A protein has these predicted regions:
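Short, often N-terminal, low-complexity regions
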Residues: 2, 19-26
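Conserved beta-strand in the GNAT
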Residues: 79-81, 87-97, 108, 113
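Conserved active-site tyrosine of GNAT-family acetyltransferases
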Residues: 154, 159
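Conserved GNAT-fold acetyl-CoA-binding loop/helix
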Residues: 45-69
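A short beta-loop-alpha structural element at the N-terminal edge
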Residues: 27-43
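Short loop/turn motifs at secondary-structure junctions and domain boundaries
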Residues: 70-75
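Conserved acetyl-CoA-binding loop-helix of GNAT-fold acetyltransferases
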Residues: 111-114, 120-133
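C-terminal "cap" of GNAT-fold acetyltransferases
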Residues: 42, 141, 145-151, 163-183
Length: 183
């Protein structure tokens, strides 16, 4: 038998869920990499730390050189950053022919990355949505991406798996999203 609380007291209740910290609900700013190139070094090191087991990400200097190409302003690749004030949160890019073995697939969403401390805030979703808006603005008919493990996330937004294949030492799903027409 459990004892009733003394008169004037209420039984202990589960604590109410605390609201998200203010920084978790502030708008996420997406800017072209060209507007904040000072983040290239931080981004290159973060990508290397996360993906260094895979060939494109094994060398910080090559990563920096890739992002320097995104600054040229002559078509793709184009990259965007998610920032909070002066702090880098993540990145995404539009590029051509991301998997050389698949030359028939021209336009790709790639390099979608959120720094560990910014995960769970919707940063990746905002980056992808922004990249899709830019792809539509550019008139791209369709986009492809590859992922080893988050197919379900992209499927919720209309991406369809078209094949699985080995790439950079892992099995990935190649996915497609039609943007214009019936490509």
């Amino acid at each position: 038998m459990t004892a009733s609380p003394p008169n004037g007291f209420q039984a202990a209740r589960k604590p109410k869920k605390q609201p998200a910290p203010l920084e978790a609900i502030l708008p996420i700013n997406i800017v072209p990499l060209a507007e904040q190139p000072q983040h290239i070094d931080t981004l290159a090191h973060a990508l290397h730390a996360e993906w260094h087991d895979f060939a494109p990400w094994q060398n910080v200097e090559k990563i920096r050189a890739y992002y320097a190409r995104c600054l040229e302003g002559h078509g793709l690749p184009l990259a965007w950053l998610a920032v909070d004030g002066g702090r880098l949160l993540g990145s995404a890019a539009l590029k051509r022919h991301d998997i050389a073995a698949l030359p028939q697939y021209e336009y790709w969403l790639g390099d979608v990355f959120v720094l560990p401390e910014a995960r769970g805030r919707g940063v990746g979703r905002h980056l992808v949505e922004h990249a899709l808006l830019e792809a539509r603005r550019l008139g791209l008919p369709e986009l492809y991406l590859y992922t080893p493990d988050v197919q379900a996330v992209y499927a919720k937004y209309g991406w369809r798996e078209i094949e699985t294949r080995p790439h950079n030492g892992e099995t990935v799903s190649v996915m497609r999203l039609v943007l214009h027409g019936s490509a």
